[in-house]
Every structure is written in structure tokens, then in C-alpha cells.
Regions:
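Binuclear metal-dependent hydrolase catalytic cores
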Residues: 2-229, 316-350, 356-361
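Cap/insert and terminal regions of metallo-dependent hydrolase folds
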Residues: 2-18, 217-218, 224-229, 235-339
Length: 362
């Protein structure tokens, strides 16, 4: 017993000595940890680890409502060696970097519509595309007609900053010809149109119903026998169900009206009439989780991934309340999306692989 007590006292003394040493040398330890962490992060390129196939990463699963764990709406699609970003909400360009996916490698940005929360991360994206990739050409920005004004506005807003970057870093690092974005509008005369076909990848835009916001589209990606759809913002859409027939993955927006109604009531009770009106209005042009599930079932999708989540879901404990009875309406897996999730569809296979590139919601 005496030896046990002595051992305990010795262990406690060693712990205290260690703590005091760590405190005394915290600056040196901090510098060492920072150097080590920086070296590891700078060497990360998660694109290099992806096999040939079609991949979709969630770089923003949030909405305009504040949520520290979720950037604004954003998806990144990789097909072979091609990479396209779909929508770019606030904080999403930074999230791409944290995911170990360099925006400098983006071949283009595809916009579903021009709501502010889908474009307010465009400035950082085009800056990272230029500076991290030493790009010699602007970032192509695809979207329905009207995208020209969006791109022109951001280019004008960043024009002065571009001159600062060139003067400071030099044209070899930031070639003047690579600054900003360049609009690539397409016409949506019918329910669907091919946006581009290149090196085995086909991207199709299709109309959705986000009235009164027009134009509004979603996108289908096909590559080497694998396919996925991204809904954009929409009410439940029969056109989406038709165009996305048989996809491996459907990434669909979702708003739970019952939970938003509770936010509406709370805002009204606290004298916030404007916020209450907005909470009321947004319920009529989005899709409830159980409706998204029905669309996935009708389309025959292999997996449903919910994103652009309204209201904010700061904890996984809220997921059951958010989904309601959705799981009973779909024969496949349902995933409540979190920033940093990556889904892979290997070419020549029917499997769906999942990984996480950053830590998720608690």
C-alpha cells in the first residue's frame, strides 16, 4: 500500500513537471506544432488520391442562415481529371481548401441560379483559382442567361484588388490574363440542354421550379457509365425526376417546413416581423426532406444526399427531427450532407464509396 501511494505521488509529480515544462516552452512547442502542421497541410492534394470515376464533394451544405459548421451552397464534381464547382456560397471556397482540393484546379463554375447565397463566395473562388494555380485564363462561369451580369459585377468589384496582387507578387505568380471570371451563358429554351461534353464527361442543365426566381436549373453529370444530379434550389420537380432517371446519386436541397414554422413563430413572438415574413415566404419554393425522398424514389436514384439544409442543423441530434418519415419512403440510403463529405463512383463499377475530408457536425 505504501509503495502504491509513493508511485501515485511520483506519477503526479511527473505530470506536474511535464505541465510546467509545456507551459514554460509553449512558444517553442507552438512553433514546432505549427511548422509540422503547415508542412503536412501544404502537401495535401486529395484530388490525386481519387481513382478514375465520377466524384462529388460537399463544399457547402448550409444556407443564408448562420451555421458555423456549414458553408453556403457548394458542390465540387470531379470526373477523371476534370473538376467543376457547382454554386459557390459564402465560405465555400475556403472549405474547398480545407478539404485539400485546390480551387486552382477548377475547370469552371456552374451556377444554378443567381440568389446571393449561391454566388457570394465567387470572389474568393476566382481569387484562389488565379493565385493558387497561377492561372493564365479567367475562370469560366457557366449559367443560364444573366450570368454575364453576375460575372461582370464581380470582375468590376475585384479589378482594383487585382492590380494590388500583380504589383505585389509579380506577373509570374499572378499572370494578369488569369484574373477574374469569364461568363459562359447557355440558353434554356426547353426542359434540358447540354452545357458541355469533353473527355467523356457530359453536363446537362435542366429547369427546376424555384419561382419567382427565374432562370433556375439543376445539373446532371455523366461519366463512363456513372451519373449524378445536383438539384439546385427547387420545389419538388417532375422535370428533375425525369432528367435524373437512374442516377447513382441525387444531391437534393431540403427545407423542413415544420421546423421553419417554429422559427417563424419565435420571430413573431419577439417582435421581428421582417424575419417572420421571410421564414413564412421561404417555405413555398423549397423541397421538404420527404418530398426529396419521393423524387429520388421516382427517379430510381441509388443514393440521396440532402444539402442546402434549412433550418441550420448544428448537431446530428437534430437529424431525425429534420428527416421526419423520409426514410420510410425511399429504398436506398439517405445521407444528411455535411461539409467535407466525398462520394465516389468508380468507373466500371456500381459501388458508391464514401469518405470524409474534414471533421463533420457534432
Amino acid at each position: 500500500m505504501v509503495w502504491f501511494k509513493r508511485f501515485g505521488l511520483l506519477a503526479l509529480a511527473l505530470v506536474l513537471i511535464g505541465a510546467l515544462a509545456a507551459y514554460a516552452f509553449q512558444a517553442r512547442l507552438g512553433t514546432w506544432l505549427f511548422e509540422r502542421g503547415t508542412a503536412q497541410r501544404m502537401g495535401v492534394d486529395n484530388l490525386a488520391a481519387l481513382g478514375d470515376g465520377l466524384h462529388v464533394g460537399l463544399c457547402g451544405t448550409g444556407s443564408p442562415m448562420p451555421n458555423l459548421d456549414r458553408a453556403g451552397p457548394c458542390n465540387v464534381v470531379i470526373a477523371g481529371k476534370q473538376m467543376y464547382v457547382v454554386d459557390i456560397g459564402e465560405g465555400a471556397a475556403e472549405t474547398l481548401n480545407v478539404m485539400g482540393i485546390s480551387p486552382g484546379k477548377a475547370d469552371g463554375l456552374l451556377l444554378t441560379h443567381f440568389h446571393s447565397d449561391h454566388i457570394d463566395g465567387f470572389g474568393p473562388l476566382m481569387l484562389f483559382h488565379w493565385t493558387r494555380g497561377s492561372s493564365t485564363a479567367p475562370l469560366p462561369v457557366y449559367g443560364p442567361k444573366g450570368v454575364e451580369a453576375i460575372v461582370a459585377g464581380f470582375n468590376a468589384a475585384y479589378a482594383t484588388d487585382n492590380t494590388y496582387r500583380i504589383a505585389h507578387h509579380g506577373p509570374r505568380v499572378v499572370p494578369p490574363s488569369g484574373a477574374g471570371g469569364i461568363a459562359r451563358p447557355f440558353d434554356m429554351a426547353g426542359p434540358a440542354t447540354t452545357v458541355l461534353e469533353h473527355d467523356g464527361l457530359k453536363i446537362t442543365a435542366f429547369t427546376v421550379n424555384h419561382d419567382p426566381i427565374k432562370p433556375s436549373v439543376g445539373y446532371r453529370f455523366d461519366y463512363k457509365g456513372r451519373s449524378l444530379c445536383i438539384s439546385g434550389d427547387t420545389k419538388k420537380s417532375s422535370n428533375l425526376e425525369a432528367v435524373c432517371k437512374g442516377v447513382d446519386i441525387l444531391v437534393h436541397e431540403a427545407l423542413n417546413p415544420a421546423l421553419v414554422q417554429k422559427m417563424e413563430a419565435a420571430a413573431a413572438a419577439n417582435g421581428q416581423a421582417g424575419a417572420a415574413k421571410i421564414m413564412h415566404d421561404i417555405q413555398d419554393y423549397h423541397t421538404a426532406p420527404w418530398e426529396a425522398v419521393e423524387s429520388a424514389q421516382t427517379a430510381g436514384a441509388g443514393m440521396l444526399v440532402l444539402s442546402h439544409l434549412v433550418p441550420p442543423l448544428p448537431s446530428r441530434w437534430l437529424y431525425a427531427a429534420f428527416l421526419g418519415d423520409a426514410k420510410s419512403r425511399f429504398s436506398g440510403p439517405i445521407v444528411v450532407g455535411e461539409d467535407g463529405m466525398m462520394f465516389s463512383l468508380p468507373a466500371g463499377s456500381k459501388t458508391i464509396d464514401r469518405t470524409r475530408l474534414i471533421r463533420g457536425t457534432g
